[in-house]
Structures are given as C-alpha cells and as structure tokens.
Amino acid sequence: FDTVFVETVGVGQSETAVHSMVDFFLLIQLAGTGDELQGIKRGIMEMADGIIINKADGDNVDKAQMAAAQFRNALHLFPPTESGWSPKVLTYSGYYNIGVKEIWDMVDEYMAFTKKNGYFEYKRREQAKYWMYESINDTLRDTFYNNPAVSSMLNQTEQQVLGNEITPFIAAKRMMDLFLENISNTKLP
C-alpha cells in the first residue's frame, strides 16, 4: 500500500504503539470543546508530526483559528523533535473539503525533509528494532503464563503475596525459578 491510515481512540496508550509503526503521526483536534490543549497532558502532542484542527467551518471557523494559534504557541514549549522537523498546525473542514491539499502538502514536505536528513530510514530501523523486542516480550510473557507449572502455582503464590506471607520480589523469583526449571514443558505460542 502506498498510504495507510491508522486511527486511534485518542486515550494515550494506543497512540504510543501506533507512533512506533507509522511514518507520519497526525493529531486531529476539534475546536471549541474546551480541551484543545489536552494533548499536552497525555504527551500526544510531543509525538505529533502535524496537527489539524477539524471542523473549521461555519460558526466554528474563529474557534478553529484560535485553537490552531494555541497549538502553535504550545508547540514552542516542547523540545526540538528528534527528526529536526517543526510540526505544523493546520485547520481543516471535511464538510467543505477545505484544507485537504494543505494536509497532503505537509505530509509530503515532512517525508521529503526526513528522507533528506536520514531520519526516515533511521526511524524505520528503530521501529523494526522496537517491534522485534515487543515480539520477544510478548512471546516470553505468553510462554511464561502458558507454562503448566507456572499456571498451577500462580494463584497460590499470588495469595501468599496478598497475605503478606512473602514479598512480591520473592514471589517473582520463585515463579521465575519454577518457570526455568520447567521450560522444556512449554511450547512457544
């Protein structure tokens, strides 16, 4: 595919995962909702390569322009991006189809900028490395919890921790020791 869009629910966790798999991270905000700069709290703005204020039409045009100005000002509070790119803030109206060309131009400009300075390839390599380790971690976690010896002792060990009979650290060590003793009985997922 030449272009793939990945939409998230906007609560913070999924954006971190998505950021590690995309070339361009676009934050879409609505004006006039009272939480224009809420993205700062979640750290999402720091990940954004571009920000668009949606529904910049009708009675909302002035609010959208004000929100765009607030975001531009807020971006100055963040350290420079790793790519060297300065994120842009644009307004957009899907209803009137205003701003689409400017958004695509921004994405194209970003891609050209990051390919020229080598960041595009660097980020792709870092993403590949990140997903390799994520896959290893997922496999290790699944292998651990699917181990018959571990699954048979986990609840009992948890109860010992909850009853203050052993510390969480001793419990973890015991469970890891049990896992390592019985790893040959476990199949990879």
Give the predicted meaning of each segment:
Residues 1-66, 70:
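Phosphate/Mg2+-binding loops and adjacent switch elements
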Residues 9-10, 95, 127:
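Short beta->alpha linker loops
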Residues 50, 56-116:
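Canonical P-loop GTPase G-domain recognition
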Residues 52, 75, 136-140:
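A general structural signal for short secondary-structure boundary/capping elements
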